[in-house]
């Protein structure tokens, strides 16, 4: 099983990529003086091929939130939402990252009536309809509330945040 955090909305969701992570070609990585796996240095491999190596200069910045579009129909499991637009949220809770997530939610709700934040264990036998659902006003949403959501072990949970 793997855990999927994602947002659902009937309004278009913006992507927000981790600015500290870069995808490099082997040549770019060599120019930076990075140690490269010998398989990638093989003569049969085109070292100019873009986006082969995932690079983050500071390992602590790797956990910065990465928010990108997903298609819920691409998942074998029912991921729970009936919302039209979805973005995956890759993150690890910390004092810094929770503020980024909180601001993302607040910004989205400037133009949308509500936003769902889901935590789903893919491969779970529990059905989304029976998962934990809570409603919260954006003015009441805090870092502590998001921390509780993050550490919860519920198979399916949805936090609906309204403006």
Predicted regions and their residues:
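Structured alpha/beta or helical-core interaction and ligand-binding surfaces enriched in interleaved
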Residues: 1-163
């Amino acid at each position: 099983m793997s855990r999927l955090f994602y947002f659902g909305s009937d309004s278009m969701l913006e992507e927000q990529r981790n600015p500290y992570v870069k995808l490099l070609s082997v040549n770019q990585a060599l120019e930076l003086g990075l140690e490269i796996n010998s398989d990638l240095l093989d003569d049969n491999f085109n070292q100019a091929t873009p986006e082969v190596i995932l690079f983050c200069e500071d390992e602590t910045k790797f956990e910065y939130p990465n928010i990108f579009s997903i298609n819920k129909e691409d998942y074998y499991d029912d991921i729970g939402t009936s919302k039209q637009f979805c973005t995956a949220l890759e993150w690890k809770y910390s004092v810094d990252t929770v503020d980024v997530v909180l601001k993302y939610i607040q910004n989205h709700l400037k133009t949308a009536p509500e936003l769902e934040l889901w935590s789903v264990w893919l491969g779970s036998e529990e059905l989304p309809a029976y998962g934990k659902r809570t409603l919260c006003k954006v003015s009441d949403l805090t870092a502590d509330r998001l921390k509780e959501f993050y550490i919860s072990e519920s198979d399916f949970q949805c936090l609906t945040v309204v403006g």
